[in-house]
């Protein structure tokens, strides 16, 4: 492989910026740029050491940056290649000049995610662990971070490998029974034994799939839409949850003319919180566009926060909103409890049909804790805190597990219908192959390229 280089820290002003190199020529290329005290070179440095010095243009001798350089030699590195990390002062100009020097001296600009891709290709991590790196970077809550860390440390991989080993052992027994039925010292693979083996694998796959809903919520966040008539307090609710002003809050109906989105962490539940323009008919063309977008977002939501005005009677528009969210996960919020109550609370509970109803005065910052508790109780059962739980959150993994379960079901149905054992073997082999796709065994190169292209440069 050639040697790659990239800036591994976010662009912009900061205390430190890092230029990373990986590959067989990493140390040699860095040495061409490095000027150490008393003529010290990086080539003579031991692995996993850090060295003070300067980066200089090898053609002009001009000093570009004062640096600390880490030397990490293969195979005890993230990529299992020689790795150099040049710690520069944070900024844009100097760190870019250091990168350009590395490219001029023989390195190639890394593609997005190429460092992690090399870690995968060199056997340092498997595909599910590589995907967990991105999950860790994108984690919005402590629980999401813990999920990613467990996967990155190989908990899911270990379970998948164990299931594959069990399937492979079963397949080997089937093969021996087919090819050498006369051998007395080989355990006979009866239909009953085959059912036991296949059912055991199915049970574990189903257990993983039961964790997928909460896992996906932690990974991607709940698409949460705030709806209500104009001026009932939707934008105030958004700002209360986000703890900063994101939307215009006035007494004028219709001041939110578009969809406003923000990530918030509500007691460990990540919400992609969306404030919508009031869903009503309007003559204002700009506001009408916002209303149309609101309706589309509503259809795609995981959770609805339906806001009502506690100081006004229920209107026909309010009732229509209840009808629009029929069958969806909804929390009803009666806002403006600081004003005289005019709403029919019993009628609201009737329309809510058993779904949570909370009261708030967002102006006085009252009732937010009750709302957060309602959100937590809807989507968090406590299972995520279990340190022993292994589960899936990645959409690709979930899809593969569903296919693997179907393959096991097909095998069990075949056994029940007394089909030839070699036909059952095909379905079990299919399940074994599918599970291998989770950890990166026998996956197409285009899929690998597509997965790593989602990473940032330098990772």
From Swiss-Prot:
It is an enzyme of class 3 (hydrolase). GTP binds at residues 231-236, 250-256, 275-278. Its cofactor is K(+). Residues 221-380 form the TrmE-type G domain. Pfam families: MMR_HSR1 (PF01926), MnmE_helical (PF12631), TrmE_N (PF10396). Mg(2+) binds at residues 235, 256. GO terms for cellular component: cytosol. Keywords: Cytoplasm, GTP-binding, Hydrolase, Magnesium, Metal-binding, Nucleotide-binding, Potassium, tRNA processing. This is tRNA modification GTPase MnmE. It comes from Bacillus velezensis (strain DSM 23117 / BGSC 10A6 / LMG 26770 / FZB42). The lineage of its organism: Bacteria, Bacillati, Bacillota, Bacilli, Bacillales.
